[in-house]
Amino acid sequence: MGKKKKIDKNKDKTVRSINNNIRSSVRKLNPILRGIVGKKVDVAIRDLQFSEKRITRDIRKTISSAVANAENNFQYDIDKLIVKEAYCGKKITMKRFRPRAEGRAAPILKPYSSVTIILSELNKVESHGTKS
């Protein structure tokens, strides 16, 4: 017999949304995701909307999905939601070949990534530091 799981009632409730197949590399996604962490959801969506990067459309959709999850599944107030975490990971890399001179071929790598967005309510995030 195993130990019983301890249930922490004070655990911070979060909402997450995962987009598993984004056609971009992790290197291009990371700076965008770092820019939205800690912001309110509407501010993050606005910042992504006015960004010139192609991939921000997919990130915006993922945030909108997380907001819908928070509103419909957990009845959170969407005005109080902030982006608690946003990170990405490597997925598959499609390998293609481009014909070159004298019968040679050059590889083309087409990377895919997964994006995870975690939202939390503003009053549930603990502040750090000694000043109030």
Predicted regions and their residues:
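Ribosome large-subunit tunnel/peptidyl-transferase-proximal elements
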Residues: 2-87, 114-122, 126-132
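A generic structural micro-feature
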Residues: 75-77, 98, 107-112
